[in-house]
C-alpha cells in the first residue's frame, strides 16, 4: 500500500478551506433565510439560517453585531451579507455575516418600533416634564460644530436675548459613533452643572441620517438629564425617540432657540463674534483636510477588513472558554463527591461510632444472658421437680404406706425366707412404726 496517496483529515480540511477562501463568488454572498437556533449571546453570535430544504451555520462577530439597529429573534426572516468559509475545527462550512436586516420590513423602522415599545413600557415617555427657564444665563447646545444648527441657534439667541451665553458641545450627529458621542456630550453638560437649558439637534435628513437620535443610549441620557432638554431633530414631520423623551420638542433649531429665550431684545450685539466665526472657519478647513487624509488611509485593505485576520481564532476562543467552564464544573462536582465519600468514611471510622456500636452489643449480650439464665433456672427447676417425683415414687416409705413392710434381724434386712429359722426373733417395719415377732414356720418356694 502506497501511503503517500493518502491525505490526513487536517490536510484535506485545509485544502477545502483554501478552495472556499479563493472562490471569488464566496467572498461576498447575499443570502436570505430564517433565523434558527438563535439565542442572544454577550459577544459573538452563533446560529443557523434555513429555508424549507436546507440549513447553513452562521457566525456574526461582536463588532459586526453591534452595528445592527434591530434585535434579531428566533424564526425571524432576514437578509444577510457575508462571506462563506470552512471552519477547520469542525470541518463544516459556514457564512460569516457582515450585515443583517429584516426581510421585508425595514431594519431601521423595526428597530425604532422595538425601542419605542420598550421605553414606553418602562414609562420613559411619561416622566414629568421639566420647566424651561424663561431667562437663561447659559444655554448648552449639543450638535455638530460645522452644521447650520449652531449658526441658527446663535443667531436667534443674539437677536432675542444677547446676554445669554451659548456653549457648544460639539458632537458627531451622523454615523455609527454618533449616538455614543451625543450621549457623552449631554452627560458632560450635566456634569458642568451651571446650564439653565440644553438644546440637542441637527438638520433634516433621511431616517438613516437621523438614526443616532433614535438610539437607546441617547434616550436614556436625555431622560437622566438634570437640565431641561429641548429636542430639535430633522424637519417638523420627523419624530425621533429623542423628541419623545425630551422635555420639549421644537420643529427647527431656530424654534428651539426661541423656546429657550424670552421675547426679542435689541439686535445690536449680533456681530460681536465675527472674529470667532472666522477662526472657526479656518479650523473647519484644517479639520476637513485632515479628515480627507485619514479617509484615504482607512481605504486600505487592512483597515477595510481587519477582522478576517482573527475570525477563526475568536470562534476557537469561544469554544475553549465554554469547554473550560464545563471542565471546571465537572471538577467541582468530582471534588464534592470525594468530600462526601471521605466524610462517610470518617464517620464510620470514628471511635465514638465504634464505642456506640460496642455499647449496643453489650446491651444485647446482657439481655441474652438474662434470658438464658432465666431459661436455665426454669429448666433446672423442672428437672429437680421431676427427680423429686421419681425419688418419691421409689421411696420405701412410699411403698410401705401402701401396706408393705420389710423385715430385719439383728438390724440387717432379711431379703429371703431362707435367711430365717423357726423361733428366730425379727422386727417388722411399718411406715408408722415397727413390731417384734417370732418365726413359727419357714416355708420356701
Swiss-Prot record:
Any single biological process term in GO = DNA catabolic process
Q: Which domain of life is it from?
A: Bacteria
Give the EC number(s) under which this enzyme is classified.
3.1.11.6
- This protein's GO CC annotations: cytoplasm; exodeoxyribonuclease VII complex
User: What UniProt keywords are attached to this protein's entry?
Assistant: Cytoplasm, Exonuclease, Hydrolase, Nuclease
Q: Which InterPro entries match?
A: Exonuc_VII_L, Exonuc_VII_lsu_C, OB-fold_nuc-bd_dom
Q: Where in the cell is it found?
A: Cytoplasm
Keyword Signal tagged = no
Can you state which reaction this protein catalyses?
Answer: Exonucleolytic cleavage in either 5'- to 3'- or 3'- to 5'-direction to yield nucleoside 5'-phosphates
Q: Which Pfam families match?
A: Exonuc_VII_L (PF02601), tRNA_anti_2 (PF13742)
In the record, the note on similarity to other proteins reads: Belongs to the XseA family.
HAMAP family, per database record: Exonuc_7_L
Q: List the NCBIfam families hit by this protein, alphabetically.
A: xseA
Q: What does this protein do?
A: Bidirectionally degrades single-stranded DNA into large acid-insoluble oligonucleotides, which are then degraded further into small acid-soluble oligonucleotides.
Instruction: Describe the protein's quaternary organization and the partners it interacts with.
Output: Heterooligomer composed of large and small subunits.
Question: What is this protein called in UniProt?
Answer: Exodeoxyribonuclease 7 large subunit
| UniProt source species | Limosilactobacillus reuteri (strain DSM 20016) (Lactobacillus reuteri)
Amino acid at each position: 500500500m502506497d501511503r503517500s496517496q493518502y491525505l490526513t483529515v487536517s490536510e484535506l480540511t485545509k485544502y477545502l478551506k483554501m478552495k472556499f477562501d479563493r472562490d471569488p463568488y464566496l467572498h461576498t454572498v447575499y443570502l436570505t433565510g430564517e433565523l434558527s437556533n438563535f439565542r442572544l449571546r454577550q459577544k459573538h453570535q452563533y446560529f443557523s439560517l434555513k429555508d424549507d430544504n436546507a440549513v447553513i451555520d452562521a457566525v456574526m462577530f461582536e463588532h459586526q453585531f453591534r452595528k445592527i439597529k434591530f434585535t434579531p429573534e428566533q424564526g425571524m426572516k432576514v437578509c444577510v451579507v457575508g462571506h462563506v468559509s470552512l471552519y477547520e475545527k469542525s470541518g463544516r462550512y459556514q457564512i460569516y455575516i457582515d450585515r443583517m436586516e429584516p426581510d421585508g420590513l425595514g431594519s431601521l423602522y423595526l428597530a425604532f418600533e422595538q425601542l419605542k415599545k420598550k421605553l414606553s413600557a418602562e414609562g420613559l415617555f411619561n416622566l414629568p416634564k421639566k420647566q424651561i427657564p424663561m431667562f437663561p444665563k447659559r444655554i448648552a447646545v449639543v450638535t455638530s460644530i460645522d452644521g447650520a444648527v449652531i449658526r441658527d441657534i446663535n443667531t436667534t439667541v443674539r437677536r432675542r436675548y444677547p446676554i445669554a451665553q451659548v456653549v457648544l458641545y460639539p458632537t458627531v450627529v451622523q454615523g455609527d459613533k454618533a449616538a455614543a458621542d451625543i450621549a457623552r456630550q449631554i452627560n458632560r453638560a450635566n456634569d458642568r452643572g451651571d446650564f439653565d437649558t440644553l438644546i440637542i439637534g441637527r438638520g433634516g435628513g433621511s431616517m438613516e441620517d437621523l438614526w443616532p437620535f433614535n438610539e437607546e443610549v441617547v434616550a436614556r441620557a436625555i431622560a437622566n438629564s438634570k437640565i431641561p432638554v429641548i429636542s430639535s431633530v430633522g424637519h417638523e414631520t420627523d419624530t425621533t425617540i429623542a423628541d419623545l423623551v425630551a422635555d420639549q420638542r421644537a420643529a427647527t433649531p431656530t424654534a428651539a432657540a426661541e423656546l429657550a429665550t424670552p421675547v426679542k431684545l435689541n439686535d445690536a450685539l449680533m456681530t460681536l463674534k465675527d472674529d470667532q466665526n472666522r477662526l472657526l472657519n479656518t479650523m473647519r478647513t484644517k479639520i476637513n483636510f485632515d479628515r480627507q487624509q485619514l479617509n484615504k488611509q482607512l481605504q486600505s485593505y487592512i483597515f477595510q477588513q481587519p477582522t478576517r485576520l482573527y475570525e477563526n481564532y475568536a470562534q476557537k476562543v469561544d469554544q475553549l472558554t465554554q469547554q473550560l467552564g464545563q471542565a471546571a464544573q465537572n471538577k467541582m462536582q468530582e471534588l464534592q463527591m470525594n468530600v462526601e465519600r471521605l466524610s462517610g468514611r470518617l464517620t464510620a471510622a470514628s471511635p465514638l461510632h465504634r464505642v456506640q456500636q460496642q455499647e449496643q452489643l453489650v446491651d444485647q449480650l446482657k439481655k441474652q444472658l438474662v434470658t438464658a439464665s432465666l431459661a436455665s433456672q426454669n429448666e433446672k427447676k423442672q428437672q429437680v421437680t421431676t427427680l423429686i417425683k421419681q425419688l418419691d415414687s421409689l421411696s420405701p416409705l412410699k411403698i410401705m404406706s401402701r401396706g408393705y413392710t420389710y423385715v430385719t434381724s439383728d438390724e440387717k434386712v432379711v431379703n429371703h425366707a431362707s435367711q430365717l429359722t423357726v423361733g428366730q426373733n425379727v422386727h417388722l417395719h411399718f411406715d408408722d412404726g415397727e413390731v417384734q415377732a417370732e418365726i413359727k414356720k419357714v416355708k420356701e418356694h
